[in-house]
Amino acid sequence: MPEVFVRFIEPIRSHDGVAYYPRVCGRKDDIGRWEAWLEFEPDDGGEVLRSARETIQPNQTDVSYWAGGLTRVYLEGALDRAHAVTHRNGHG
């Protein structure tokens, strides 16, 4: 079951002006590594966007460390990628 590592309190705005609250989620894969992705929850109650896998780390501690280093610019790019994944999969 996925776990939330970090919830960011400052929203990231999409190109259409919607404010999204990012969070870093992750889970253990079949061979014991941890994969993590970003989810973006819109403040308007719309669909939560999810990026593709953003990192693979050997353990939970390293996922937390990675998440703690994410910058606003990285989160903005990840939101763009999450929008692209959503549209490519026929949502939104």
Question: Each predicted region: which residue ranges?
Answer:
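Negatively charged, low-complexity tracts enriched in Asp/Glu with abundant Ser/Thr
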Residues: 1-19
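Phenylalanine-focused residue identity feature
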Residues: 5-8, 40, 74
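Weak global preference for isoleucine
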Residues: 9-12, 31, 56
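A short, structured beta-strand/loop element
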Residues: 20-54
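Mixed-charge, Lys/Arg-enriched low-complexity segments
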Residues: 45-92
